[in-house]
A protein has these predicted regions:
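Intrinsic-disorder/low-complexity regions
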Residues: 3-5, 144, 160
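Bacterial N-terminal signal peptides that target proteins for export
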Residues: 2-13
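Fold-level signature of zinc-dependent metallopeptidase catalytic domains
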Residues: 28-56, 153-279
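Bacterial N-terminal signal peptides
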Residues: 11-22
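N-terminal prosegments of processed precursors
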Residues: 25-152, 273-279
Length: 279
């Protein structure tokens, strides 16, 4: 009996060691794998940053490599407008059809949440355009955007301090409801939707978005860069749609076929008819 016990105990020890090794290998990293954010003090650049925004320098190369090669969750530090960093666990989460993802491997999207407070969550993407994020942090919605003049220059700002386009470029229509009434209605609908979401299965809607030649040129002139801009747009829409409506938007596999690079040959006239198609 003693001899059998001596054989069994080492076997149990080996089995436990194997189990703990597997669990350790499956566990997400606890420490941030990217922390390279430093505040920029350039007066010229700060003057063009959003009010109360935070201008930062980074090295996008290691961050891009980390995210493009990630097959499982990674942890990175993201800059907050108040001057601090928060560690977020990012998990690959696509907003494009698999075929489109395979065709443009330099574009990846992620869902993520803060390690210290999982209620703070949002979505992030990496592409040739850089790193972009939109996430909830406490009572604020925070954005991280790349500045156009430098691949390694970024700004972190809250929604209330977002940069606003010139009013001259924004034709305005008379509101059908008073702002206070509309705000109360939206808050009520959002609250009701969040209560129902736990009982609702997430639905995916396939989406096709065309881009004019002007849009593509504005974002760098290539289909990949225009698609990357559309991916950032859809990724951010999904922050709201998934939370409030249990809806996931996904760009179709052939979406790049309707991204045009030349304003002179695209099928859009940029007249009121085109505007009607977008309303």
């Amino acid at each position: 009996m003693k001899k059998n016990t001596n054989k069994i105990l080492p076997m149990i020890g080996l089995w436990l060691l194997a189990v703990f090794s597997c669990l350790a290998g499956a566990a997400p990293p606890a420490a941030s794998q990217f922390t390279q954010w430093t505040d920029s003090r350039s007066a010229a650049l700060l003057s063009r940053a959003p009010a109360q925004g935070r201008l930062l320098k980074t090295d996008i190369v290691p961050l891009r490599h980390l995210l493009l090669t990630a097959r499982e969750a990674v942890v990175i530090s993201v800059p907050l407008p108040d001057g601090s960093l928060a560690d977020f666990r990012l998990t690959p989460s696509r907003v494009t059809a698999p075929g489109l993802l395979e065709k443009y491997p330099g574009i990846r999207t992620f869902s993520g949440y803060q390690l210290d407070n999982p209620e703070n969550r949002g979505r992030f993407d990496i592409s040739p355009r850089g790193f972009y994020g939109m996430f909830r942090y406490g009572a604020e919605t925070v954005y991280i955007d790349r500045r156009a003049e430098d691949d390694n220059l970024y700004v972190s700002y809250s929604y209330k301090n977002r940069p606003m386009p010139s009013r001259a470029l924004m034709p305005r229509l008379s509101p059908k409801k008073e702002p206070q009434e509309l705000s109360e209605q939206l808050a009520r609908v959002s609250s009701e939707n969040q209560v129902q979401q736990a009982q609702t299965r997430m639905r995916t809607y396939r989406l096709a978005i065309s881009a004019t030649g002007e849009y593509t040129q504005y974002h760098g002139g290539t289909k990949e860069l225009a698609l990357a801009a559309l991916v950032t747009l859809v990724n951010r829409l999904n922050v709201v749609y998934q939370r409030d409506l249990a809806i996931n938007l996904e760009l179709v596999a052939g979406n790049d076929a309707i991204i045009y690079t030349d304003a002179a040959t695209d099928p859009f006239a940029n007249d009121s008819f085109d505007g009607g198609l977008n309303t």
